[in-house]
Swiss-Prot record:
GO MF terms, alphabetically ordered: rRNA binding; structural constituent of ribosome; tRNA binding
Keywords per UniProt: Repressor, Ribonucleoprotein, Ribosomal protein, RNA-binding, rRNA-binding, Translation regulation, tRNA-binding
Entry GO terms, CC: large ribosomal subunit
Presence of keyword Membrane: no
Database matches in SUPFAM superfamilies: Ribosomal protein L1 (SSF56808)
Originating organism: Mycoplasma mycoides subsp. mycoides SC (strain CCUG 32753 / NCTC 10114 / PG1)
Keyword Repressor: yes
Lineage: Bacteria, Bacillati, Mycoplasmatota, Mollicutes, Mycoplasmataceae
InterPro entries: Ribosom_uL1_bac-type, Ribosomal_uL1, Ribosomal_uL1-like, Ribosomal_uL1/biogenesis, Ribosomal_uL1_3-a/b-sand, Ribosomal_uL1_CS
CDD domains documented for this protein: Ribosomal_L1 (cd00403)
Protein name: Large ribosomal subunit protein uL1
GO biological-process terms attached to the record: regulation of translation; translation
UniProt function note: Binds directly to 23S rRNA. The L1 stalk is quite mobile in the ribosome, and is involved in E site tRNA release.
Length: 226
């Protein structure tokens, strides 16, 4: 069992066990209980009443955070038809099949996310088993398979985050950094919860959202009212 650090114990002591906090108070507490020396990420975790084994309850998508993520992502655009648009949108890397081969043959991953135009998807299928486990496979549901590569790159660079329910029905999303003002984190939280409610499967019965927890990198979990 991993040893709990003194800093984490001190942070944990500030959070009342089983208490569910109003959003503003929870965010303030998350900032107070950040245990790292760097600018930690603030994350929200939704525990949903879904069964991801059912096809109609597999939740996946992307949401634009109005206050941004506080993180810069390296974007790879794979295209044969929209090279100029991708370059003008300031994608970090732009190319075609030669980059797919580089991923396949050199285990190259000098990027955070892939945007692809539709004609590239058949070729990308050849490395689906490589990209899939890393969460890098482009998908129309997240807006990463598109002919409008300029918008996709712009959204990602500025403020878009992807989400996907795991096999336990949990969704984890970044809503900013500890250095963000509370108001900015609130903006992002509200955008995220609105999105999660929007994609509620029609077949879900009873309460859809079971609980919501806020945390920072290596910080304690804080339950949030909703």
């Amino acid at each position: 069992m991993a040893k709990i650090s003194k800093r984490f114990k001190e942070a944990l002591s500030k959070v009342e066990k089983n208490k569910v906090y109003p959003l503003t108070q929870a965010l303030d507490l998350a900032k107070q209980t950040s245990t790292t020396k760097f600018d930690s990420t603030v994350e929200v975790a939704f525990n949903l009443n879904i069964d991801p084994r059912k096809a109609d309850q597999q939740i996946r998508g992307a949401v634009v955070l109005p206050a941004g993520t506080g993180k810069t992502q390296r974007v790879l655009v794979l295209t044969n038809t929209k090279t100029k648009e991708a370059e003008q949108a300031k994608a970090d890397i732009v190319g075609g099949e030669e980059l797919i081969n580089r991923i396949k043959n050199e285990n190259w991953f000098d990027f955070d996310i892939i945007v692809a135009t539709p004609e590239m998807m058949a070729k990308l299928g050849a490395i689906g088993k490589i990209l899939g486990p890393k969460g890098l496979m482009p998908n129309p549901k997240t807006g990463t398979v598109t002919i409008d590569v300029a918008k996709a790159v712009d959204d990602i660079k500025k403020r878009k985050v992807e989400y996907r329910a795991d096999k336990e029905g949990n969704i984890h999303l970044i809503i900013g950094k500890v250095s963000f003002e509370i108001e900015k984190l609130e903006e992002n939280f509200k955008a995220v919860i609105d999105e999660i409610r929007r994609v509620k499967p029609q077949t879900v019965k009873g309460d859809y959202i079971k609980n919501i927890t806020l945390s920072t990198t290596m910080g304690p979990g804080i339950k949030v009212q909703f």
